[in-house]
Amino acid sequence: MGLYQVISDLMSVEISKAYEPTKVEEKWFSKWISAKAFHADPSSEKQDYGIVIPPPNVTGVLTLGHVLNNSIQDILARRARSKGKEVLWLPGTDHAGIATQSKVERHLRETEGKGRRDLGREAFLERAWEWKEKHGGIIIKQLQKLGCSCDWDRERFTMDEEYSTEVQKCFVHFFNSGKIYRGKRMVNWCPSSLTALSDEEVIMKPQKSKLFYMRYEIVGREGEYLEIATTRPETLMGDSAVAVNPKDERYADLIGQKAFRPFPKAEIPIIADEHIDPEFGTGVLKVTPAHDKADFEIGLNNDLEIIDVLNPDGTLNELAGEEFSGMDRFEARDHVAAKLDDMGLLVRVEDYENNVGFSERADVPIEPRISMQWFLKYPKIEESIASVSDQDIHFRPERWAKTYSHWMQNIQDWCISRQLWWGHRIPVWYRKDRAEELQKAESLDKETAGDALHVGIDPPEDEENWIQDDDVLDTWFSSWLWPFATMDETTKNKFYPTADLVTGPDIIFFWVARMIMAGYEFTGEKPFSNVFFTSIIRDKKGRKMSKSLGNSPDPLDLIAQYGADALRFSIMRIAPSGTDVRFIENKNKDEAEVNDYPQVEEGRNFANKLWNAARFRQMQGSTDGVKELPDLEELSIYDIDILRKLDSLNEELSDSYSSYKFQEIANKLYDFFWSEFCDWYLESIKLSF
């Protein structure tokens, strides 16, 4: 019986006839926790293995993406333990500034009919912390239900007191070194969340828009017009010029002339700019410096007036004119077009497909907006580029290294301030007698502020004479410190740099690149050696799974129906490295019935097969203790054959682990155990029992 005896002898408790995954999984997870099986000991002399969890949003819930990501991390952590390493898998959650504040504000509106400004900052933050305490542990409990072998005693939160201190130290460090400054720039603005966003927080979506062709009369040439094409007629009240390409012969004689802006009626210059595309529309551009990034640059180069006609919430303000003031931007688009039509200045409207930037969190079109914000000049750019190109840090799949390199070589200063209340408040204080002057300054840094600005972890001693900056830091400004700010010095000395990072390619710029730069800046070392980018999970139609589409099942329902092991194993079997995952759901005609998930059902069947095989062995006699294999001559041909296949499997799996080919590992294990071990070996030796 050889191999089978060795495997089954590990079991001494009677195995029940029916496999009930919920009971089994809850029992063993409880035993693991009681035995501190996942505890990481920094004083251990064993070889270290460290991995930090990408912290999910504190008020989030488990998704299939979390299942995939954390199953891979669990495989890596358990594999390292099996190899005799001291393992730290560090868990935690992110405070998720915009996402959490939006949920709290929605709750306040629904339950009390109030907004955050009705409560005031201090009272609102009390409610936010109450919300976090009530809902913040849900996803941690769900990850435990999934069976994740983290060191749960080390759970961290990005707004823990100690972690917050590290974030403040980071800001002070960069301000004192001249890398943080405050400036008036055009930023991405979310009219829903009322905050600035970084470029990485904006996602481009294809939209079916309209292209409006309108006429601006040329000053001094009555009856002659310039025809202009635009997707945004609602901002024409902020036009301060009309621009053409200097090489466009159609308009060469008009450069230096003026045209009439339709309303409020005003003469605006016709200028030349080489960035104008003669092929777009009519080759004539309305220049609105306050509401377009390209126009803003044109405005700076030509000293144009900046006329902001939008309020922060996306409604039009008084500069747009009384008839449009207070009107939503999209409603105003139609009204402005109608007025142009009434004036005989609307030529035609065409269907037009273009890409529009949306706030990733609020899912609304963003607005380019000129605003005073805090910015960071990124540190350690060259070292961070070299670490990946020289493969000191390995990206898997390797193609993501090119994406990373391209972004790093074209990197822009990071807008780190957010107009929120939930988050790490910027540790900057303005002297009261100069606060208004400093906050309106076009540029502000360590050199220009002098002693009128206090930047520090603690407020100034005479705090009553100072006003703290209202803004908070971008959530990613705290999470880019995650690999080392989560560890005390003893733990860091043992487990940092970490071995692996498992994450999605969608946050390669938000998080991965920034962690690499922060690692070199604050520790002088890389934060991790390997980055494994997971696949995107899609439905059988190829659509990305999301709550809004209603095509994403609740993993907890799947766990209840099939078991956590079944779900984890099935996800790994369908998740090839470097390509998207197709997750199949078969809808039942009877809505009262539970839907069918054939891939997860295969996972459950496999777990059931393991259970029955173990039970079959237990029924044959004693399973106490692990016994050594007998001599070769005492083994049957069936034993020898299965041992040979097992040796071959071990070699193949070792190669697959080294290459992070988790789908390959799952399928090899499935094929070996189901076909070779159960269907062939067990059936062959049954007569010998």
PLM region spans:
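N-terminal, positively charged nucleic-acid-binding surface of large information/translation enzymes
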Residues: 2-247, 271, 288-301, 305-320, ...
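Long, charged, mostly alpha-helical binding arms that flank functional sites
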Residues: 16-17, 98, 106, 348-362, ...
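Active-site-adjacent bridging/hinge elements
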Residues: 45-53, 75, 111-115, 140-147, ...
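Short glycine/proline-rich turn/loop motifs
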Residues: 52-58, 120, 387-398, 492-498, ...
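Structured ligand/cofactor/substrate-binding pocket environments in proteins
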Residues: 65-77, 93-94, 163-166, 225-341, ...
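Gly/Pro-rich turn-and-neighbor structural signature
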Residues: 162-193, 201-203, 215-219, 407-477, ...
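Flexible, glycine/threonine-enriched loop-and-boundary segments that flank and lead into catalytic domains
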Residues: 197-225, 414, 443-473, 481, ...
